[in-house]
Amino acid sequence: MPIIYMNIMLSFIISLLGMLIYRSHLMSSLLCLEGMMLSLFIMSTLMALNMHFPLANIVPVALLVFAACEAAVGLALLVSISNTYGLDYVHNLSLLQC
């Protein structure tokens, strides 16, 4: 496995560990989620370039579209929650309260 793939997988694992460790704030969870999506985007782009298959180039673009939608929804939830409750702690939120 080339070193570039190992670096990208390491960045995904570090973002995943950050998501698991720093899950108390919604903002830090969103940042770790964006780091995971960025590493997945770079990995899928490199795979599409190495496959030499024209239809494989659609996958990174579709992943980027879903990542942008996820970021927009996440930031909208962050603004809504911080305006309603005044903080962004994840453990204070419940499905029954929202």
UniProtKB/Swiss-Prot annotation:
It comes from the Eukaryota. Its main location: mitochondrion. Its EC number is 7.1.1.2. InterPro entries: NADH_UbQ_OxRdtase_chain4L/K, NUOK/Mnh_C1-like. The keyword Transcription does not apply. The chain crosses the membrane at residues 1-21, 29-49, 58-78. The keyword Translocase applies. It is an enzyme of class 7 (translocase). One of its GO terms (cellular component) is respiratory chain complex I. Keywords: Electron transport, Membrane, Mitochondrion, Mitochondrion inner membrane, NAD, Respiratory chain, Translocase, Transmembrane, Transmembrane helix, Transport, Ubiquinone. One of its GO terms (molecular function) is NADH dehydrogenase (ubiquinone) activity. Core subunit of the mitochondrial membrane respiratory chain NADH dehydrogenase (Complex I) which catalyzes electron transfer from NADH through the respiratory chain, using ubiquinone as an electron acceptor. Part of the enzyme membrane arm which is embedded in the lipid bilayer and involved in proton translocation. Core subunit of respiratory chain NADH dehydrogenase (Complex I) which is composed of 45 different subunits. This is NADH-ubiquinone oxidoreductase chain 4L. It comes from Semnopithecus entellus (Northern plains gray langur). The gene is MT-ND4L.
